Amino acid sequence: MILIKNGHIVDPQNNLNDKFDILIEKGEIKKIEKNIQPFAGCEVIDAEGKIITPSFTDIHVHFRDPGQTYKEDIESGSKAAVAGGYTTVVCMPNTIPAIDDVPIVRYIIEKGEEIGLCRVLPSAAITKGRKGKELTEMALLKDAGAVYFTDDGAPVMDSFIMRKAMEYAGSLGTFVADHCEDLNLSQNGVAHEGEIAAALGLPPLPPEAEDTMVARDCILSIQTGMPVHICHISTKLSVEIVAWAKAMGAKVTAEVTPHHLYLTDEEFLDFSCIAKVSPPLRTHEDIEATRWALASGIIDFVATDHAPHAHYEKMQELQACPPGMLGLQFALPIVLELVKKDYFDLNRMVEVMSIQPAKKIGLKPPQIKEGEIAELTIFDPFETWEVNKETILSKSKNTPLLGRKLTGKVKYTFFKGKIVYRD
């Protein structure tokens, strides 16, 4: 048995936003009351000053397995996930080979279950080999356990293919998610087209490369009546397009990454390849737009786009180095900062970190409720910690946050009634 004492529980699903004790027996939440007395043989966790929420779900991570496990693998990725308070993650299909066949889908699920730290689920490719030419066998992949379809890392440039994919996935009760980038506009750009790129002489990547593809996908959703999900939305205009599409009745959802809520293109001022990400880091105006869109519900939830790369890969010259940065361990402190700055409250934080992403992939969100299996995150909202190579649990350490201090630290993560992470 485990008794969690004195923690402040936040779970809008059960109208909880107060200080309670939680008694967990054989993995199940037995009691949620004030002043539960400890007894012999019971592990007591003193959560005074801590916040307890349902554990988090991230529908967009890159665990690089199969094919690039020198960057990350399912075990190291799972360790990073639970250290960030996550108990469900969805792996992207830009592996080697791509997740476009049933055996690879099964491999991801079985490997995650074998490790057992968190729920590791696969997405599957929209097109074979992620080449944008021919649709995968979506029905077979979904039956094998793929939770949705995406060619993430690359857009679906062919609008006819994208329309057919939306119709096929929608008929199966799932959805497609698009990496919205018009390659004819982005060319080989590396930094947001603006003052910073111009001053540094960096190849510019215009925001229209994202905006036009977001508009296309939203229009296809309106016309077909089928759902579409916008990955890592990052521009003010894209936010406005999604708001318009939702007002038109489109079944469109959107995610935003922690780095697009927190970091700007000023990270390039030291010419650091660590700052290269796709879509690129944007301006303060774009960040402000995404923050308020997340608060209002135009953006539905947070997804980290956790993208590990080896040190030597990120030390190449800008055009050669791969885009991407870590995110799983930094999402909580970044989103929590928005709570502290009054963009939204803790209830909304739980919505965007836990409830809405779980619902999006058809899962019942974790709940803090008597009779439920404990899937909880306990964090200290005021603990400051340094991001360094020791505190990062991923194999790779590629983040512009190295050496910086963040406030908000996960102390315990419960998965299927067991403690899978303790700080």
UniProtKB/Swiss-Prot annotation:
EC category name: hydrolase
Top-level taxonomic group: Bacteria
Give the EC number(s) listed in the UniProt record. Answer: 3.5.2.3
Q: Which Pfam families match?
A: Amidohydro_1
Q: Which reaction does it catalyse?
A: (S)-dihydroorotate + H2O = N-carbamoyl-L-aspartate + H(+)
In what pathway does it function? Pyrimidine metabolism; UMP biosynthesis via de novo pathway; (S)-dihydroorotate from bicarbonate: step 3/3
Q: What's a BP term from Gene Ontology annotated to this protein?
A: 'de novo' UMP biosynthetic process
Q: Which UniProt keywords apply?
A: Hydrolase, Metal-binding, Pyrimidine biosynthesis, Zinc
Q: Which Gene3D superfamilies match?
A: Metal-dependent hydrolases, Urease, subunit C, domain 1
- Residues bound to Zn(2+) 1: 60, 62, 152, 305
Can you list the GO cellular component terms from the UniProt entry? cytoplasm
InterPro entries to which the protein is assigned, alphabetical: Amidohydro-rel (IPR006680), DHOase (IPR004722), DHOase/Allantoinase_Hydrolase (IPR050138), Dihydroorotase_CS (IPR002195), Metal-dep_hydrolase_composite (IPR011059), Metal_Hydrolase (IPR032466)
Sequence positions that bind substrate: 62-64, 94, 309, 323-324
Q: Which CDD domains match?
A: DHOase_IIa
Q: For Zn(2+) 2, which residues are the binding ones?
A: 152, 179, 232
State the needed cofactors, names only.
Zn(2+)
Q: Which residues are catalytic?
A: 305
Family (UniProt)? Belongs to the metallo-dependent hydrolases superfamily. DHOase family. Class I DHOase subfamily.
- PANTHER family, per the entry: ALLANTOINASE (PTHR43668:SF2)
> What role does this protein play?
Catalyzes the reversible cyclization of carbamoyl aspartate to dihydroorotate.
- Spell out the NCBIfam families in the cross-references: PRK09357.2-5 (NF006844), pyrC_multi (TIGR00857)
- Protein's name according to its UniProt entry: Dihydroorotase
Organism of derivation? Sulfurihydrogenibium sp. (strain YO3AOP1)
